[in-house]
A protein has these predicted regions:
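N-terminal hydrophobic or amphipathic helices/low-complexity stretches enriched
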Residues: 1-22
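Oxyanion/phosphate-interacting regions
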Residues: 2-4, 11, 215-350
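Flexible, acidic active-site loops/lids enriched in D/E/S/T/G that coordinate Mg2+ and/or position polar
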Residues: 39-120
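Alpha/propeptide regions of enzymes that mature by internal proteolysis
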Residues: 17, 26-38, 42-48, 52-55, ...
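Short acidic loop-to-helix transition motifs that present clustered carboxylates
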Residues: 66-68, 187, 206-213
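Short glycine/serine/threonine-rich phosphate/pyrophosphate-binding segments
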Residues: 94-103, 108-110, 189, 210-214, ...
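Active-site-adjacent structural elements in enzyme catalytic cores
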Residues: 84-95, 99-135, 139, 171, ...
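Acidic beta-strand-loop-alpha-helix segment within the catalytic core
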Residues: 117-204, 298-305, 310-344, 348
């Protein structure tokens, strides 16, 4: 009888194949100003891979509704759904950074995370219904220093100025040496102003905040904190990566206006609306798998490199249970490489 560990080992590279194919099928839309077409190409490739994989995958975090684009939606089924196949909760963003692809800019990746759901267990990931959330991500070095040196905890309720002080103390840095990444949106102006006023180094990104939020947990990324209001699905995908890396993301729902707040309160309590979720609360259990493939260069991964008749992809694969992190460089011969697309129900050349 297969154990959860065996099931994860058997299936994890299928998830990498899905993000690789999404990157290869969407790279042709780089810089062409049509983010919906790039997103559709990535979704088609991901669906095509899972049409051949014996799992019962249910999408608990999708990307299509928020982006108003063709997508893979909440409740969609991935896999063959054969009776005895393993069940997975799946969160994905076929392209995190669609605007970047459309503009030919860096910082776009294809991302999938999954959590094995044993029989009798309800779910492996939490579905947060808000479009946007307040998010704060930091690496294991900060978490460990707070625990061992009894520093003040980092929370979303603290003024961000205090968070900078704690982070600097935990990392044995001056505040002026901290590097903070913020999504460049008007709703994040408060954080932008604080970082500048306190003298820390600010890195603004135009789109694609999963890679940015994972970066503080990666050695040599040069990023210390990620903060700001961004997409909730991206936050949960980030949590599955940080589960393997030992980092932390704090997340709280952020209604854009009163009508959205009232709509959210139809499905969640006031306490849940105000709750700050931790990594372990967003991704329960130890079975999370996270994988991503670079489309254009990002702090997390290099993008697809097209040279002559070859395409080189760079992917990352993480498992929370073993805390193993694999970097995968694959060279694809475009003369022989084929991918399965759901739209045409067959294999085709890239």
């Amino acid at each position: 009888m297969s154990t959860p560990k065996d099931i994860e080992r058997n299936i994890e590279f299928e998830f990498v194949r899905a993000t690789e194919n999404a990157a290869l099928n969407s790279i042709h839309w780089m810089g062409r100003g049509q983010k919906e077409m790039a997103d559709a190409a990535a979704c088609d490739a991901i669906n095509g891979v899972f049409d051949l994989v014996d799992i019962r995958g249910e999408v608990v975090i999708g990307e299509g509704i928020k982006d108003n684009a063709p997508g893979i939606f909440l409740g969609d089924r991935l896999g063959t759904w054969k009776e005895d196949s393993p069940r997975f909760d799946i969160a994905l963003d076929p392209i995190d950074g669609t605007s970047n692809i459309a503009k030919g800019m860096p910082n776009s990746i294809s991302v999938i995370s999954a959590a094995y759901v044993p029989d009798g267990q309800e779910n492996g990931m939490v579905n947060i219904p808000s479009f946007y959330s307040e998010k704060l991500a930091f690496g294991p070095q900060i978490s460990e220093a707070i625990r061992l040196r009894e520093l003040a905890p980092i929370t979303l309720d603290n003024p961000f100025e205090k968070t900078l002080i704690v982070a600097a103390a935990a990392l044995n840095k001056r505040i002026s040496d901290l590097v903070i990444v913020v999504l460049d949106r008007p709703r994040n102006q408060k954080y932008i102003d604080i970082v500048r006023n306190e003298g820390a180094s600010l890195r603004l990104i135009a789109d694609g905040d999963i890679a940015a939020a994972v970066a503080p947990s990666l050695p040599d990324s040069g990023v210390d904190l990620y903060v700001g209001i961004g997409g909730t699905p991206e936050g949960i995908l980030t949590a599955s990566a940080l589960k393997a890396l030992g980092g932390e993301i704090l997340l709280r729902m952020w209604p854009r206006d009163e009508p959205e707040r009232e709509e959210l309160l139809k499905s969640v309590s006031q306490a849940d609306l105000e709750k700050v979720y931790t990594t372990d609360e967003l991704v329960t259990g130890e079975s999370a798998i996270f994988c991503a493939t670079g489309i254009s260069d990002s702090p997390l991964l290099p993008g697809v490199k097209l040279v002559g008749n070859t395409a080189t992809t760079h992917s990352i694969l993480m498992r929370a249970r073993s805390q193993t992190v694999r970097y995968i460089r694959a060279v694809h011969n475009l003369g022989t490489k084929t991918i399965n697309l759901r739209s045409i129900k067959r294999e085709t050349n890239v």
